């Protein structure tokens, strides 16, 4: 169920032009600074804002416009004809209804079976809220209800426009978990400029600048590209895919297996062995040495190989490393890079000072 876009649109002086294809599963994050065109693109996909060009989802044509002034063969499906569920920064709920009333209204319009309504209520954990009016809900509760409503009617695509931007940190994690769960059964196009949300959710990423998708690909690949937009950021971060290993009770350390290596994290004893996880490693938290140190307090020191190097500022060098078949970044001084005589193919050791689950 891929989404193929070849569209353009204008709002005032702002021009958007996008040619891209959404993968048929998982979460694709539209990432970029405010004003890059992320929300505008999402609204065009939904049919809320006009655009020219072609939008095709799976075998269904949602939008097609030609150059002819007569436009006899144009296709432009209305919002309600597109099999989508939507969430926005502010939940668009009916404030004169209870939570149950909001769900019932959408279920009737989308002809959702009773069993599906019950399933969505259970999935989003909103059963205790059903009798409450939505104007008495907290921000986190309102967004959980909005997500439940978006899931009704079995949408084939979820469009989420910065759904967590108005929430405090205490409410975000639960909703991130719910969105990740929903993405197991329906593809998601997710707008954000928040790096934590990108790291937590993205399978694929579209990087937007000035109304264009300037790069797209698997999130791990785009994060670790030396010439990529994300690697140039001060908070440049890489992702490693691993799985939960053993827990050392006397040291309160949790092992995470990455290939044939193990990284150690404090605590986390409640994780399930074998469970797939993601690790985030900031480039500034990786230092390099040519031989294995024997007297370091750093727990995670792993063999790696230099893939490439790039100057990223006065006296700063970004090093791309291959570690257990995946790539991470190290930000070191240019002087250190020269003293170590680093070049592609150099075998060395990466000292990872901090690593965290996402």
From Swiss-Prot:
GO terms for molecular function: ABC-type molybdate transporter activity; ATP binding; ATP hydrolysis activity. The keyword ATP-binding applies. The keyword Iron does not apply. SMART domains: AAA. It catalyses: molybdate(out) + ATP + H2O = molybdate(in) + ADP + phosphate + H(+). ATP binds at residues 32-39. It is an enzyme of class 7 (translocase). GO terms for cellular component: plasma membrane. Residues 2-235 form the ABC transporter domain. Keywords: ATP-binding, Cell inner membrane, Cell membrane, Membrane, Molybdenum, Nucleotide-binding, Translocase, Transport. It comes from the Bacteria. Its EC number is 7.3.2.5. It is a peripheral membrane protein. It is found in: Cell inner membrane. Residues 295-358 form the Mop domain. The complex is composed of two ATP-binding proteins (ModC), two transmembrane proteins (ModB) and a solute-binding protein (ModA). NCBIfam families: modC_ABC. Part of the ABC transporter complex ModABC involved in molybdenum import. Responsible for energy coupling to the transport system. Belongs to the ABC transporter superfamily. Molybdate importer (TC 3.A.1.8) family. This is Molybdenum import ATP-binding protein ModC. It comes from Alcanivorax borkumensis (strain ATCC 700651 / DSM 11573 / NCIMB 13689 / SK2).
